[in-house]
């Protein structure tokens, strides 16, 4: 009889029990590390019994395929993370040994979202949360639209921290996903026409949002879709990331047997205190970026604990306590060259800066619109 419903046949069940009995016998005699699983199902079985640390060690490596590419995963901790599914209590955390790709965290965002159709006419705005010498400088600007912005459309006015906003055109779009400009207009200083009061942060208009929960990179990490179908806006101000048409989701083409043992992990990430009100967000994902605390870099804000340091980083650090300095153990490479890699932690005093590890292992930050390296992590659960 065929095994069409995916249940274990008697023979397969016996094989699995034999394998587990071998593991248990080896562990009982202190030789657990000498017997290695031969499948991801074996690995998951050990994790669920709380025996993974008896067979593996922090720093051991496991591999899977993503298409024709072999992904090398470092084991960075055991039972550090909390499975999102409460029926499970154990976890084994993996992180890619090298930077996988370079991905924009978030694109520069829209200034205004049209809850209802915005008729053609003259409007004025006073962008805030910016810089005295650039966008969001406290001045009021006006512009005239010859064409209506439809309901669900956006007004986009990008700029810079150190440049006169008048150097930048204003553009309108029919939706957050549209890349077709309805019209382009020139702003001037002034208070003519109707005031638009519900505006995005000036920092995010120029450089993107540092909110990880709403980020484009988080969506990419947890997508298995083909290029062009990965990104969907998380907020009304979102704009398409630079990679929207040319990157398949991180899970696309990945081994099915590997994905089957990766469970969703509950993660806490602090929010900035400029636009997001401080505090934290909770996410439940298969794949995630590490926080500064998890990388043995201390807390962004003392009131939010973004997980716990993984032994891979705390036990083999160049330092004996959490630090933000150069640390060779934190450096990630791509084709032999050290790279900058995104964290999920924001720089809490800004709405656009995201924390990253630089090429020497130091803590740093930069704008969300940059494309830095990603070294995703996940948990066998």
Residues covered by each model-derived region:
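Collagenous Gly-X-Y triple-helix signature in extracellular proteins
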Residues: 21-381
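Short, low-complexity N-terminal tether/leader segments at secretion or assembly junctions of large
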Residues: 1-22
């Amino acid at each position: 009889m065929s095994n069409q419903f995916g249940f274990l046949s008697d023979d397969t069940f016996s094989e699995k029990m034999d394998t587990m009995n071998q593991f248990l016998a080896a562990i009982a005699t202190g030789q657990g590390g000498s017997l290695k699983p031969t499948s991801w199902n074996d690995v998951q079985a050990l994790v669920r019994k709380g025996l993974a640390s008896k067979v593996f060690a922090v720093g051991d490596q496991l591999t899977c395929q993503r298409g024709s590419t072999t992904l090398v995963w470092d084991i960075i901790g055991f039972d550090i993370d909390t499975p999102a599914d409460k029926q499970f209590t154990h976890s084994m955390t993996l992180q890619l040994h090298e930077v996988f790709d370079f991905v924009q965290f978030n694109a520069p965002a829209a200034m205004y979202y049209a809850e209802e159709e915005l008729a053609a006419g003259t409007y004025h705005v006073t962008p805030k949360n910016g810089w005295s010498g650039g966008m969001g400088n406290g001045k009021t600007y006006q512009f005239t639209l010859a064409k209506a912005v439809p309901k669900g459309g956006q007004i986009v006015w990008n700029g810079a921290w150190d440049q006169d906003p008048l150097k930048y055109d204003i553009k309108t779009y029919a939706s957050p996903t549209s890349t077709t400009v309805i019209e382009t207009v020139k702003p001037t200083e002034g208070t003519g026409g109707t005031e638009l009061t519900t505006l995005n942060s000036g920092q995010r208009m120029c450089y993107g949002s540092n909110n990880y929960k709403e980020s484009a990179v988080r969506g990419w990490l947890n997508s298995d879709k083909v290029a062009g179908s990965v990104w969907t806006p998380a907020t009304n101000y979102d704009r398409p990331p630079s990679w929207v048409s040319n990157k398949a989701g991180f899970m696309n083409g990945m081994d099915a047997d590997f994905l089957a043992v990766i469970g969703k992990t509950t993660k806490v990430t602090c929010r900035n205190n400029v636009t997001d009100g401080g505090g934290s967000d909770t996410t439940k994902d298969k794949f995630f970026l590490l926080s500064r605390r998890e990388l043995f870099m201390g807390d962004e804000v003392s009131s939010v604990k973004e997980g716990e340091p993984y032994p891979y980083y705390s036990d083999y650090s160049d330092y004996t306590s959490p630090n933000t300095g150069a640390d060779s153990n934190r450096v990630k490479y791509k084709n032999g060259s050290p790279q900058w890699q995104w964290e999920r932690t924001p720089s809490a005093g800004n709405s656009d800066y995201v924390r990253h590890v630089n090429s020497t292992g130091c803590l740093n930050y930069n704008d969300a619109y940059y494309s830095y390296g990603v070294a995703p992590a996940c948990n066998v659960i």
